[in-house]
């Protein structure tokens, strides 16, 4: 358990709290008798924030800056335990740094890119307001000392949207967490409490949310609040919810294991309606496997097995039946959201031959990346590939074989047996014929991606889709107020980040997961604080 930023104005307990709330709140229902009896202390604030990742941190800062007394909790031990200290970058709009350039990405351009790009699946009102809140979120980070590479520097309207909105983090872990701690410490009315997991919302007799029950290793705490913002990071660590919303998919969780869906379920129990769109922010490096150690790769030079890079090179992909299922160019060039087809099966596979392995280990990685792939990855990840040749590729393959997620065989028929890929021989025969003809009539893969698989021995690699977070959850109005099944506001309840029904299927713009989480946190924090005096 860790307690940071304690202010005498925000940290009040015991009988003092009960007396203070007697004149301002209706009677509070005990959400769970056992939890109520176990509560060892009671705290009071204006706004309680559940979760201190990207959205929760911004919500806490924004609410405090609007004059609210804020208590923000997280189940992690510290900021280092939140995924937000390890994310790659944020897609943001009209930050103070962007405005220094003539051709900066405008709010209108961002909206007109995202809304039609998602086929109008987004909540248009909340998308508009998230975009409007983006600059405040970006400036919190910039002014707070977070170091960025500004991918938008010098761009024009002809450049990719990824670069035009790109704020790429140059630090991770403790250096980034130190900045977050300093931001919180600078606000007298903000208390952060780590090692506390929100488990249930408190409601009054009218159904308004007026607090949260939190558990820690030291006991149960009741936080009484005039409003609660839930921003707990989705449900990637909840296998049952993954099966429910992603049709039995097996996902490698690249986050930190605290995102188990509790926040979404708390909101549902309080009467909030869950939305219809569920997606994932996929691993931008193409692949993962639960048998591997580490289980995924998300940037070059991270000590992970480069066999995970193969989908980025456009190699043939098959499902557990040994059959192709997509145009592999999509995986190479739109990695963040082309992971959607992978969710249809727990596993997918790529196959290469010895000739390809020999080529990979003797040529720079850049030779295997198309211009489309490079544009999709962005400058920060590309820098990691500068001058890299996978000279130890065969040793990497042997490691994958030892860990059980790769196999080697002298024939395609024998290779198929390793993972039960029944139709693989016929698939490779048809693929080789397409390579010879220079035309793929099955999934229309461009010829420059195609290379025959003919020279044994042959190799197969098994992958699970990897993801940073799930996307999708509780419906809100245009200002992050949770709504019920009638689209009426659940009083006192706000939702931010990936716990909200803010995204489309599939996830559309790379970097907007972190960027929109940050901005929605600002929006929720501003709204919750302003609603107190409305």
List each model region and its residues.
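N-terminal secretory signal peptides and thylakoid transit peptides that target proteins
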Residues: 1-19
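C-terminal segment of N-terminal export signals and the immediately downstream linker at the start
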Residues: 5, 26-55, 64-66
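Core beta-strand elements of the Rossmann-like FAD/NAD(P) dinucleotide-binding domain
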Residues: 43-45, 218-227
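Glycine-rich FAD pyrophosphate-binding loop
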Residues: 65-85
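Conserved redox-cofactor binding core of oxidoreductases
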Residues: 132-219, 239-240, 287-288, 295-296, ...
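A glycine-rich dinucleotide-binding beta-alpha-beta segment and adjacent secondary-structure elements
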Residues: 200, 422-507
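Glycine-rich loop(s) and the adjacent beta-strand/alpha-helix scaffold that form part
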Residues: 223, 227-293, 514-523, 527
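An anion/pyrophosphate-binding glycine-rich loop and adjacent beta-alpha core
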Residues: 264-266, 273-418
